[in-house]
Structures are given as C-alpha cells and as structure tokens.
C-alpha cells in the first residue's frame, strides 16, 4: 500500500496507530515498496546537510513503533528537483541563511499548497538566529506575513500516535549561549 501525501498527513495527524494495523509483508519490503520515504531537501544557500542523526532517529522510530513499510534509507533531493514534489514528507534543516532561488521558491510553494508536509529543523536552536529569521522571512514572502502561526498545545500533531501536552520540554536552554532562550512552541503554515 503506497500512501499519497494526503493519506500520510491524515495518518500523521489523525491516528497513525489504528490506521496501520495490517503489517507489511516481507516480500513488499524486499521489493522496495514502502509507505514512507524520508526525503531531505538540499537548497543552494546555507548548509542543508546538518544533523545526520535526526533522519536515522526518525526512521528507526517509525520502524520500531509502527507497522508502516519504512524505507530505511534517507533520500536527498534538491529543492529545485521536480521529483521532490512527489514526496509525502520532506525535511529541511540548517544553521545558516535560507534564501531560496526562484526555482526552489516555486517548488516549495507548490509543494506546500498542494498538501506537502515539510519538517523544518533549525539546528542552531536559536530563536533569533540567522536560520530562523531567514526561513521565517522566506515563508512570509511566499505565503504572507501572518502565514506562520504558533501551534496550540491541543493541535492533533501532539496526539497522533503518542500523547504530548505540547512540544518537547527542556530543562535547559537550547542554544548554549547563556541567554535562557527555549522553544516553548512549534510553528506551522496550514494551507486549507
């Protein structure tokens, strides 16, 4: 069973456990038929190839806690590559400047407006850092100044598989600079 992007998102935000009761067959895995592919997006500006552990941690967790047929390999596609438009899940990360070229911008907008899910990871962990500010500026220029909104702790993403009362709590600052900045919320652009 290959999932469309919309089906994957519905499962992610609306009850992954119950929807994936039927386990994968060995032949399906052997043939390379997967329900989930992890796609990392590379972009021309900044440093897209950071935090090598995150993809493997997510992939391992999906294999361990779900019965989805999960491709164990991370796939890397350029944001300018039209094949990224077919991926049900994309990951974009970095520490530095995010400034999409015209093709990257068009693909990002088309992907999101058509229901794509992009997990964006600020590897600086700095609320006021270059990655956060430049990514938010890109989103404002593409989707409008008020497009990025804080997710309430009651959002379905916090109760889709495990139940959380909000984003992961930390007992220490995340950026290591002594300014006590911690992420108390997640942000999203929700295209209806």
List where the protein language model places each region.
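N-terminal secretory signal peptides and thylakoid transit peptides that target proteins
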Residues: 1-16
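Glycine-rich, histidine-containing beta strand-loop boundary motifs that form or position
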Residues: 12, 121-122, 152
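Hydrophobic h-region of N-terminal signal peptides that target proteins for export
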Residues: 18-22
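Aromatic-Pro/Gly-enriched surface loop or interdomain linker
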Residues: 23-89, 93-96
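Short alpha-beta junction capping motif
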Residues: 38, 89-132
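Extracytoplasmic/secreted proteins, especially bacterial periplasmic and envelope-associated proteins
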Residues: 53-57, 61, 103, 107, ...
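Structured segments of extracytoplasmic/periplasmic soluble domains
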Residues: 61-69, 93, 110-114, 138-145
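An acidic, glycine-rich "communication" segment
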Residues: 125-192
């Amino acid at each position: 069973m290959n999932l469309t992007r919309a089906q994957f998102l519905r499962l992610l935000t609306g009850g992954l456990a119950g929807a994936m009761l039927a386990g994968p067959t060995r032949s399906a895995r052997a043939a390379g038929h997967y329900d989930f592919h992890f796609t990392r997006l590379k972009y021309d500006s900044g440093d897209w190839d950071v935090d090598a552990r995150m993809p493997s941690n997510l992939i391992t967790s999906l294999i361990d806690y779900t019965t989805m047929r999960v491709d164990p390999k991370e796939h890397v596609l350029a944001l300018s590559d039209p094949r990224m438009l077919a991926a049900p899940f994309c990951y974009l990360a970095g520490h530095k400047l995010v400034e999409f070229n015209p093709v990257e911008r068009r693909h990002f907008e088309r992907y999101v407006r058509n229901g794509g899910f992009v997990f964006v990871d600020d590897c600086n962990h700095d609320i006021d850092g270059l990655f956060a500010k430049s990514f938010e500026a890109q989103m404002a220029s593409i989707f409008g100044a008020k497009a990025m909104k804080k997710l309430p702790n009651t959002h379905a993403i916090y109760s889709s598989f495990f139940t959380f009362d909000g984003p992961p709590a930390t007992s220490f600052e995340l950026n290591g600079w002594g300014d006590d900045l911690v992420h108390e919320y997640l942000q999203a652009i929700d295209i209806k």
